[in-house]
Amino acid sequence: MATVTELKAVLKDTLEKRGVLGHLKARIRAEVFNALDDDREPRPSLSHENLLINELIREYLEFNKYKYTASVLIAESGQPVVPLDRQFLIRELNAFEESKDNSIPLLYGILAHFLRGPPDGAQNVLLTESTLHPATKHLSWKPSRRPDDDHVRKDTGPRTTTEELPAAAQAVSR
């Protein structure tokens, strides 16, 4: 008869081979977080920038089937449970989506934009300095304490498309 240790090892191997063990661990972590999370303590209000960033991350996580990670992000950040409208995100980010396949996360299109690099002779300001705060204030800047009138500068460069990163699109198509 097999020992308890041997049975545990066989069970663990079986769950790993089926791809279930990782999902179980993620689900347990999410449930533990939800149990420990104090709903009575109000979350700080999200800045406009954080709302957009969190939504891009949520879209990416859900696309890649990281649903438990996404649930923790929503709970921990105070992001609305109902996702923001994709067209709203595109307008707010000044992005352009040429692809008819709107299932690919906008984050992939943004990545494609930066991998292309700036037009010849132009400096990419978004990568050389922060648009959220001046360089002299970087030590004291706190995202949750920015004034309401502090906004992300709109980039007037070329618009982002999701079709310009075929390698990423192929890598994520399942």
UniProtKB/Swiss-Prot annotation:
Gene Ontology CC annotation, any one: centriole
Phosphoserine, modified sites: 144
Subcellular location: Cytoplasm, Cytoskeleton, Microtubule organizing center, Centrosome, Centriole; Cell projection, Cilium; Cytoplasm, Cytoskeleton, Cilium basal body; Cytoplasm, Cytoskeleton, Microtubule organizing center, Centrosome
Residue ranges of every copy of the LisH domain listed in the record: 49-81
GO annotation terms (biological process): cilium assembly; microtubule anchoring
Annotated stretches, region: Necessary and sufficient for homooligomerization and localization to centrosomes and pericentriolar satellites: 1-104
Basic and acidic residues bias (residue ranges): 145-157
Subcellular location, principal: cytoplasm
Record keywords, A-Z: Cell projection, Cilium biogenesis/degradation, Cytoplasm, Cytoskeleton, Phosphoprotein
Region Disordered: start-end pairs: 136-174
Listed GO MF terms: identical protein binding
Similarity comment text for this entry: Belongs to the CEP43 family.
Biological function: Involved in the biogenesis of cilia. Required for the recruitment of PLK1 to centrosomes and S phase progression.
Subunit structure: Homooligomer; probably required for localization to centrosomes. Forms a complex with KIAA0753/OFIP and OFD1; within this complex may stabilize the interaction between OFD1 and KIAA0753/OFIP. Interacts with PCM1; this interaction may be mediated by KIAA0753/OFIP.
Protein's name in the database: Centrosomal protein 20
